[in-house]
Every structure is written in C-alpha cells, then in structure tokens.
Amino acid sequence: MAYTYRFIDTNENIIYVGYTAQTMAKRIGQHFTKGHLPKKCYKSIQRIEYIKWETKSDAQVMEVFYINKYHPRYNRLDHQNDHLNIQVADEKEWEVYQVIKKPNIKYEAENGVLTWIMWGALAYAIFEFLFLSR
C-alpha cells in the first residue's frame, strides 16, 4: 500500500504533491516535525488530501504525473517536466486526510479602504463622546 498526497492552501491552490509507502500519519508527522519544505509552505496548508495505491511504484508514477499536471509551488524542479507517455484512464478521487485551517474568507478591501473606514468610525465615536454628548 502506498499513497500520493497533496497540500492545498487556503486559496485552493495545490502547493505540494508527494508520495509515501509509509502510513499517512507517519509521513505527515515527518513533514510537520522535520519537514524539508519552507515553513511558509506548512503555515499556508488548509488541508491535505490523498489517493491510496496498491504499490509504491504506482504512487511514485502518479506523484510525477500530478506534479506535471498541477505544477505545485513547493515541488522541486527535478520532478517537473519528466514527460510521462502514459494515459491515466480513470483518475481516482482525492480523499481528505486532514483539515488544518478553515477556508480563507476574505473581508479585506483594496488599498486599505476598510481600515480607513474603521479608523474614521472610531474617530467619530470619540469625537461624539467628547464633544457632542454634553
């Protein structure tokens, strides 16, 4: 038994693809204790998904396939552009292994407009309290 897994960030980008012949728990634990990827990668993970394969060779081939398909930011270039002349007839479904963060919901406005509105409202509330409430 072996696995191909991927890290997905809060913006739904696939940022890393890997494979393992270990249990998912052991491999993911290694990533988060002595991982080889930048800390920025691990901090941006929203969830981890995987596909189970019958053999280690299947998982390795599919790792290269998915790296070439998705071009994840944190995969090394030596795996990319390894041209595979295979056809994947029936792609398996990815299963969620672990959710690290809730999906990113953005409330930010461009150029800090929301920040200016909040500061303006605070300033007006202080002004009203100090000068108009008398």
Feature map (PLM): residue ranges:
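Structure-specific nucleic-acid interaction/processing domains
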Residues: 1-15, 21-104
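C-terminal single-pass membrane-anchor helix
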Residues: 102-134
